[in-house]
Amino acid sequence: MRRTAAETRELVLDVASRLFYWQGIRATGVDKIAAEAGVSPNVLYRAFATKDDLVAAYVARSREQSQARFDTAIAAAGPDPRAGILAMFDALAEDIRPEVFRGCACMMTLAEFPDEALPAHQGAVGAKTWVRERFGELAGQLGVAEPEVLADQLSIIWEGTNSTAQAMGADGPPASARALVTAILDHHKPSR
């Protein structure tokens, strides 16, 4: 079966994304990705010039999918920014179920790629920045006195939920995230 270059690129990225997430980026070689995708390493390198390019595409895809999922949850919650914030955490609770969660893809990427000059590192930081900025937008819509402070607090809960789910499971400390978010939101009263 012949594929277009775009189809081959998507196939390689699909396989690489699965392997990178479940087995680790550095632990997954290009030869393994090519074999599982049913392409030669030369074909893989035509789609992605280097493994670093493939990793950057994996991070970009993960970021795009997450942002779309969280934006959809916010939109479904309606115009109330408080409901939007809670919807983001409800979506996160779905994402950290053990059958689909090994850990935060961006945090795992940052652990494996600490060099700030690498596109994968920059993409992972960008994803984390987006979450904080999204919380900032919603906090601003709430009309609280210090939306940046609320955004930071929500980001800390977000990251804590991700990391404790990875270490202790979704039924451990992450099960308290929504209650903690509700308490934080109750503490930050609108200034208007």
What feature does the model see in each segment?
Residues 57, 71-100, 151-154:
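Hydrophobic alpha-helical connector segments
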Residues 1-7, 189-192:
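N-terminal intrinsically disordered/low-complexity leader segments
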Residues 11, 15-53, 57:
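Helix-turn-helix
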Residues 55-62, 69:
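Alpha-helical DNA-contacting segments of helix-turn-helix folds
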